[in-house]
């Protein structure tokens, strides 16, 4: 294909947008970037009952968070109604469509008869004009729908980039309604006009659209358009093997941000959820774009794996700038009741991020594990009784005294600890555990010297002294 590459993401703003939905934006975005093409955003908002502005905002917010920038749009189908009506008028003039007066009740009865006879239920062409055919008299007071004259013979064939060669006999397709009685165009018609007007060369979308494709190709050809390359992506399954959906517990795209995931981790994970480049699991956005192709799109449904996403997010957290993590963590601290003033009074937040991030799967988890730095210690009574014994108190007092004059470095703190351990013939946990409890309020911390360094000399010495008084 010699035309400049133009791809599109065309969501319906009817509610929830999850990873399975946004993947249909990621792949066409990546292909357009790889091919130095154009990525178009189109909002298919003709379902007036279900389309909402909040859903549009969720789509735009999710794309922006993942860095899926678009070159054109967003185009809104409801703002293109005049164009659709213009094309409908042209098709009427060229006899490509015809009015059909069959009522819903008549169509339902027809389908029931067909099912009873073991036939595929479909419109039978009652109102389709043919040479020598006498049409029924139009019923009074009935406004017709417009149906597309689908070819009666031959097949629709396309080479799908995922599914391979697909061939559908035109005998399987009835004459599609492309305009309702009130004149509003239907989904399949609007899509074709949009793809034609916008010069879309590659349609990369979920395989729930594959049944629409032969109908859209026939309409496109009737309008003189060039058929794009189609790539129908297998569905995304949840961890239970069901189709990913809100009903089955899927999280919204922005829900991942709100749970403390980094966009680069989600993008990396999403890229691998239906595409591969050898055994590569971790790659940057730039590397993904460089590698992306249609040939390596998966042909089987991809299954969401939350543990794998956590593993990836942990990798990106460890690689992330500590100052960036500190900013991202602040809302999570606030949700835990630790406000900006409390953070300002406590240890350097950037330093806390650097110490605590390696063990965390999410930024939220970093905040949860770091509350000890910004709250007064409240150790469990049973833990105190277990670790802060009369036998260890002299060693604690000696350690506290040593810290008053020691150089305040990680190495000096470790040296003071080692000296006290040797003098009192104690093992590391016998002294480190009570120190952790008395200073941090918990025995679960990273290395004791690093933790004490962040708390600062004054806090450490005063908390040990208060506990030993």
From Swiss-Prot:
Q: Where is this region: Disordered?
A: 118-139
- What are the disulfide bonds? none
| Pfam families linked to this entry | Anticodon_2 (PF19269), tRNA-synt_1c (PF00749)
Q: What is its EC number?
A: 6.1.1.17
Motif 'KMSKS' region, which positions?
A: 243-247
What does the entry list as the binding residues for ATP?
Answer: 246
The Gene Ontology biological process terms listed for this entry are: glutamyl-tRNA aminoacylation
Under Gene Ontology molecular function, one entry of this record is: tRNA binding
Reactions catalysed, as given in the entry: tRNA(Glu) + L-glutamate + ATP = L-glutamyl-tRNA(Glu) + AMP + diphosphate
- Give the UniProt subcellular location, in the record's own words: Cytoplasm
Q: Where is the composition biased (Basic and acidic residues)?
A: 118-131
Q: Which Gene Ontology cellular-component terms appear in the entry?
A: cytosol
* Coiled-coil intervals: none
Q: Which UniProt keywords apply?
A: Aminoacyl-tRNA synthetase, ATP-binding, Cytoplasm, Ligase, Nucleotide-binding, Protein biosynthesis
Record's function text: Catalyzes the attachment of glutamate to tRNA(Glu) in a two-step reaction: glutamate is first activated by ATP to form Glu-AMP and then transferred to the acceptor end of tRNA(Glu).
State whether it acts alone or in a complex, and with which partners, per the record: Monomer.
Q: Which family does it belong to?
A: Belongs to the class-I aminoacyl-tRNA synthetase family. Glutamate--tRNA ligase type 1 subfamily.
The identity of this protein, by name, is Glutamate--tRNA ligase
